[in-house]
């Protein structure tokens, strides 16, 4: 459930994937850049939703011109729309070239921009000149195009279409067209927020170089698999060889229970000339060992092989410029979605693999090859910040940046120039050029999408605070202070509980869990990098699996107790808030906080871990983190501890008001968890409230729902912490 890392990985290096429109008829809606209201002087839910959100970014090969998409939301119509911009970095001039498009990339040596648009009713590939002229639809596929990737010679294009190849859910009976029931025969019948009635497939189409992309042929014809992988994969999971003769692609070729319990995806090489496929991860004679599906794979034979067979997540391939090598991100162990992501390099000349980031004791996010074929740039989190790095093929890693922010690598322009996006707890994403000189990266901001917000609103300071844990270790916490903070006053404070549970508390900007809007409401926020978070070594990361309520919970309490030593913190007005595993944390703390807190808010959290095992869809996750199914009786230690310390077992000790929030389309953690917690609280006479969203998943994506979320959030906190 490592959602933040998954989203960072989905920030495409060279490809495109369609942004899901907000609203059923969003394809025809034009939303202009909204006019923000700064009268309050501080960030509000309405002003937060008025900010532009920078999406896909691309540069010409010389780095002189960039194109990027910005999504704007209209609160009244409850819809969003993306506008494509071009900026000349030599003249510093920016102009909009298309309203209603997204995922722009340069084609034809930087003279035109290809992108996705639904302007004519279905999602198709369009092209427009960099001056905004001659916009035209260049694909006319029968199905929506969900993503596209041009070959280097631009004679072919990969188009992503959904195909109706899933037999887990039976098709409707012809004489019952209005029947809504689904006959389900196996796992995985649902994923994230959708029932699995179709799968994305790559189609290879011809491009005439001017105005027409052909219909395309299914590269995985007849195969019941996904490419890209659901629910978050885009065309970063495919790559063209430099000679345009081969395609590398990511695929997890499994079905049923095996699909639901295994993370073993591989990198395959497809030859266009003879239509043959080779698995680059495993030898041709590899046979997957049998497994017990209801037990953790940690100690099973699939993870005990002496030969390197890449049995974990392998994805996002990229060829070196000369075509000799291909690199991809690789996890070592099957069933462990939060394993460290390494860079694996395959040498076509020798047929050997090597791992070139072994000395970096954290995960690789986005990456890109240097033009010299001997170095790779990448981003990765360390000590609560995501920086840019470079490694050579011998595994010598150099850190290039050291800024208080999170970078995401977009494109390697040259050995000395990188294109990146950058955000922090004080700033939303903007585009930067990073100049690399003498093993150091110097960042230069090139977009200023939300400058008026930063100039016209007051912002709180963000400071690092190291806290001693109960076992004598050091825990990094971010502390966010209200604007115009006055140390002579006393402020209510919030403990922010991170989700994942293996997602970093880095310098992230969120349009929902936004630290600045909490600070703008005069709360001090402490956000701990508790046990289980990446960026502090593998031991720290792995101390949470099988122990959800041990040291990680003590880390939370150590953080808030340490903050309460400050005279400006009112320890009689403390709250705890969090989503996903953070919601689990809140539910557990509600029965174990020893009267520290006066208010709780849990969003999409797990209330009953036994219930969670049989309700969630990606079963590899509870198998690994909870150590097995709840009915398994062998290996009793960690497994029984995971279920024996479920939050619902402490509800008799609940004594504090709690707000339970959940989306009813959340298949990762079902909304029945919130209903159960809310019912238990009310039956015990505890002041409680529940906010349900029938049309939202694990996140809240619609403008009016987002504002309702924020208003309800602060009304609840203010009721109990600002008396």
Where are the model-predicted features located?
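Cap/lid segment of the alpha/beta-hydrolase catalytic domain
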Residues: 255, 440, 449-572, 579, ...
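Beta-strand-rich domains and repeat architectures in extracellular enzymes and scaffolds
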Residues: 46-82
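Short loop/turn segments that connect beta-strands within beta-propeller blades
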Residues: 88-92, 129-133, 207-210, 271-275, ...
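Predominantly five- to eight-bladed beta-propeller fold
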Residues: 24-35, 81-82, 162-222, 250-253, ...
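Conserved beta-propeller blade repeats
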Residues: 52-66, 98-116, 135, 142-157, ...
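Active-site-proximal cap/loop segments of hydrolase catalytic domains
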Residues: 514, 519, 527-723
């Amino acid at each position: 459930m490592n959602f933040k890392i998954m989203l960072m990985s989905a920030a495409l290096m060279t490809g495109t994937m369609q942004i899901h429109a907000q609203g059923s008829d969003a394809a025809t809606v034009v939303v202009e850049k909204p006019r923000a209201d700064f009268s309050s002087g501080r960030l509000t839910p309405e002003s937060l939703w008025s900010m532009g959100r920078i999406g896909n970014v691309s540069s010409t090969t010389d780095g002189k011109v960039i194109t990027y998409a910005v999504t704007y939301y209209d609160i009244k119509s409850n819809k969003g729309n993306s506008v494509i911009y071009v900026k000349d970095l030599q003249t510093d001039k920016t102009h909009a070239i298309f309203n209603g498009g997204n995922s722009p990339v340069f084609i034809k040596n930087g003279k035109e921009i290809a992108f996705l648009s639904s302007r004519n009713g279905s999602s198709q590939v369009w092209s427009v000149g960099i001056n905004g002229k001659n916009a035209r639809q260049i694909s006319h596929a029968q199905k929506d195009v969900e993503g596209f990737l041009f070959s280097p010679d631009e004679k072919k294009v990969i188009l992503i279409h959904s195909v109706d190849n899933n037999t887990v859910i039976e098709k409707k009976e012809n004489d019952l067209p209005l029947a809504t029931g689904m006959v389900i025969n196996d796992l995985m019948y649902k994923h994230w927020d959708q029932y699995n009635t179709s799968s994305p497939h790559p189609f290879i189409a011809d491009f005439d170089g001017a105005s027409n992309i052909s219909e395309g042929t299914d590269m995985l014809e007849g195969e019941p698999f996904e490419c890209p992988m659901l629910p978050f994969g885009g065309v970063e999971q495919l790559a063209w060889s430099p000679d345009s003769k081969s395609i590398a692609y990511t695929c997890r070729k499994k079905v049923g229970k095996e699909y639901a319990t295994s993370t073993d995806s591989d990198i395959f090489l497809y030859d266009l000339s003879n239509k043959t496929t080779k698995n680059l991860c495993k030898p041709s004679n590899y046979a997957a060992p049998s497994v017990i599906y209801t037990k953790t794979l940690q100690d099973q034979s699939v993870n005990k092989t002496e030969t390197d067979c890449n049995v974990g997540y392998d994805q996002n391939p990229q060829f070196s410029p000369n075509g000799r090598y291909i690199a991809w991100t690789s996890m070592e162990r099957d069933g462990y979605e939060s394993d460290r992501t390494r860079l694996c390099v395959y040498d076509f000349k020798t047929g050997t693999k090597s791992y070139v980031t072994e000395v970096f004791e954290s995960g690789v996010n986005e990456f890109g090859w240097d033009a010299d074929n001997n170095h790779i740039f990448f981003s990765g989190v360390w000590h609560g910040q995501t920086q840019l790095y470079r490694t050579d093929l011998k595994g010598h890693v150099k850190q290039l940046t050291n800024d208080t922010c999170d970078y995401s690598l977009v494109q390697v322009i040259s050995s000395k120039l990188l294109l990146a996006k950058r955000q922090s707890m004080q700033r939303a994403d903007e585009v930067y050029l990073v100049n690399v000189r003498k093993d150091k990266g110097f960042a230069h901001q090139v977009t200023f999408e939300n400058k008026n917000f930063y100039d016209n609103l007051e912002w709180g300071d963000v400071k690092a605070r190291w806290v001693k844990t109960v076992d004598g270790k050091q825990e990094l916490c971010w502390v966010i202070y209200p604007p115009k903070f006055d140390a002579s006053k006393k402020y209510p404070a919030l403990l922010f509980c991170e989700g994942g549970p293996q997602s970093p508390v880095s310098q992230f900007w969120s349009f929902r869990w936004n630290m600045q809007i909490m600070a703008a409401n005069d709360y001090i926020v402490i956000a701990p990098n508790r046990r289980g978070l990446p960026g502090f070594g593998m031991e720290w990361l792995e101390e949470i699996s099988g122990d959800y309520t041990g040291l990680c919970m003590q880390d939370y309490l150590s953080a808030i107790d340490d903050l309460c030593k400050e005279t400006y913190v009112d320890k009689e007005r403390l709250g705890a808030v969090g989503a996903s595993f953070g919601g689990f944390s809140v539910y557990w703390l509600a029965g174990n906080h020893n009267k520290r807190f006066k208010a709780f808010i849990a969003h999409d959290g797990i209330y009953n871990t036994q219930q969670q095992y049989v309700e969630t869809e990606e079963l590899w996750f509870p198998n690994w983190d909870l150590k097995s199914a709840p009915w398994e009786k062998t290996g009793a230690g960690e497994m029984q501890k995971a279920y024996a310390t479920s939050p619902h077992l402490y509800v008799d000790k609940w004594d504090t008001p709690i707000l339970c929030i959940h989306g009813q389309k959340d298949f990762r953690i079902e909304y029945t968890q919130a209903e159960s917690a809310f019912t238990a609280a009310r039956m015990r006479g505890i002041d409680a409230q529940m906010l349900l969203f029938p049309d939202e998943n694990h996140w809240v994506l619609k403008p009016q729902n987002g504002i309702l979320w924020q208003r309800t959030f602060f009304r609840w906190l203010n009721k109990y912490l600002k008396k």
